[in-house]
Structure formats: C-alpha cells, structure tokens
Amino acid sequence: MKRTVDFSMFRCPLCDSSMDAASGKSLICTERGHTFDLSRHGYVNFLTKPVKTSYGAELFEARSRLIGECGFFDPLHDAIAELISHPKSGHEAFTILDSGCGEGSHLNALCGFDYAGKAAIGTGIDLSKDGILKASKAFKDLMWAVADVARAPFHDRQFDVVLSIFSPSNYAEFHRLLKNDGMLIKVVPRSDYLIELRQFLYTDSPRRTYSNTAAVERFTANAAHSRPVRLRYVKTLDQQAIHWLLKMTPLAWSAPKDRVSLLKEMKSADITVDVDILIGMK
C-alpha cells in the first residue's frame, strides 16, 4: 500500500520556505521557486548536486538481506520499540524520522511494531540516492528523501521520535525537528561490537579496538535528560550471512584481503552486537 504524503511537512532546505507539490512531479518552494524532483518511486531528492558516499547499491542490498532475512538486528529493534512503546502524542498516530536511514530496513522494522494501538508514520532521509531508491521501492508505505541532515527539509517540530542508528548526528537540527516532549534515540557501537571481525581482520592495528566515549559525551552534552541503555547479544551467521556482513561493514573495506578471504571461507561464525542505545528527551 502506498501512503499519501503530507507535503506540508516539508520546507525548502535552501531558503526555509514552505513547499507546494507541482503536478506530482516536483516540489517547489513558495518564496523563491527552488524546485526538487519527486521520483516516480515516491521519494524526493532535496540535494542540489550529487554527493559522493562510500555507500552504494551492493552495500544496501547486503544490509537489507542481513537485517530482513537473518534478523541480525532484531533484538535491537525490539529494544528500541520498547523504549518508544508509549509515545506521548495524543493522536492515533505518531511520527518517526530515521536520520541516515540507508535502505530503510531499520525504519521499516520499527514501524511494524504495535505501539499501544498507535500507528507509527515513518520518514527516512539519507545522503545516498542508492539507499533511498532501494527504500522507496521496497517500503512504499513510508516516506523517503535524499537529503542532508545538516539542512533537513522539514518544518520545525514535525516528529515525535528522531532516530540516528550508526549514523552521524546534527543535534541542532534534531532539536529543531522534535516536537515538545519528543524523544531522540541514537545507537552507537560499544567496544565489543563486531569484536570477532576486528580481532580476526586486524592482527596489529588500532582498529582492533574501539571506544564510543567521545560519541556518548557529545550526545550527553546535546540531549536533555539523557540516559544510556546497553544491549549485547551474539548472532550465529551462516556463510552467506558472513558475506553480507563483510559487504555491509566498513571494517572489512580496508582490511587485508587475505584475512577477508579467510573469513569468507568460514561456514559459520558467532558475531557480537554490542551497542549503547542513547535516549534523550526534548
């Protein structure tokens, strides 16, 4: 089912004016006529020029398979859904923005939960056109946009929940976009996140270890009433899932090729997911 989009939520990322839908093919700002294409697949491209990213179609395909078919992040989705299980919105539905949504698998999963009888209306933005294209084709009941979180194309106080899952954050924009009493949820890796890959791929490198101290401190400094929730679990992946994980994670991109090849030959592997779910309230 394809959702009817409320274009009134958008504002021009160039001049901050409201947007009008023009014949279903583009959005035009009401002040200066800035025009942004509306894809036939239903997403809006708010970038004025292409942006090169390291995240392409193959990565997003692997990530969607690992999340959708293997349930690699199911416990994470369960934990986040529990945190937002009682949205403060007084309406029958509440709004979620996934900032840095990639191909949309996290947002789609989270919008499928029962939130005390309230429906979750999801919107995802990402700099990668490949990711948003895949999201818009796969999840037609959600809204997608190619956009920069530093100039998010939405009016103030549009969302009950803002998500940032393994993605960069712009806290000034997050604060602007959240409704009063809104919730900010950021997921950052902990030291044991994918620790098996770190230790196998890097025998003598700083990448064998990781600390999220700086990311947690930035969140705490920018989010009111913040608190962390730690989540740690282990998933057993078969050989195909290992291949998807290696395509998905930047840990493998700069690793020695011989170590990557050896990992690909494994029939199965236990992989640790260790994260902090950081919660802040507006």
From Swiss-Prot:
GO terms for molecular function: metal ion binding; methyltransferase activity. It comes from Bacillus subtilis (strain 168). Gene3D superfamilies: Vaccinia Virus protein VP39. One of its GO terms (biological process) is methylation. Belongs to the methyltransferase superfamily. RlmA family. Its EC number is 2.1.1.-. Pfam families: Methyltransf_25 (PF13649), Zn_ribbon_RlmA (PF21302). Transmembrane segments: none annotated. This is Putative 23S rRNA (guanine-N(1)-)-methyltransferase YxjB. The keyword Transport does not apply. Zn(2+) binds at C12, C15, C29, H34. It comes from the Bacteria. The keyword Transferase applies.
